[in-house]
């Protein structure tokens, strides 16, 4: 009771689950024993009251916790520009640094390393907003670089955007998969974004961080 799990991350040793209602990360061992928050604190006093872990992802040995604003029941998120934070923790739940704060974040949930084969800057990340359906590009240091765009230079928008994935073993490396819940999550959609083949149609209307249009890079 009093628990609303929104996302999870799995390592070889532990299972980490984002409890949106309780504004905490629950850690379970690989034998499903709940661990003490003393040993896995996942604490950051600088996160404003009313924000809670919305998802947690494991990337390159680190845990990225994505925060969204709670509604009155602490069951669902409150969408809005700037309603989001991202922190980096080690696997013991110790805060390492703030990755991103507010700005373009709007109930962020999905996060993956940006595939270099899609012309994104090396070491960058893609962060999907559930709140507004945009996919943001961040540098390895957490600087916002722009949004993912289509071949015409318009921001790609996927209503109810949840998960992002790229380069699974069975796929080609220039495909980004997504899952979403459009129509206020009444429906479900799984799809993919694919880098358009070269040569691309120059001049680019907006070449910055456009996986379909790498000509004349910024």
Task: Report each predicted region and the residues it spans.
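Sequence/structural signature of beta-propeller domains
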Residues: 1-199
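Cysteine-dense, low-complexity repeat segments
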Residues: 196-218
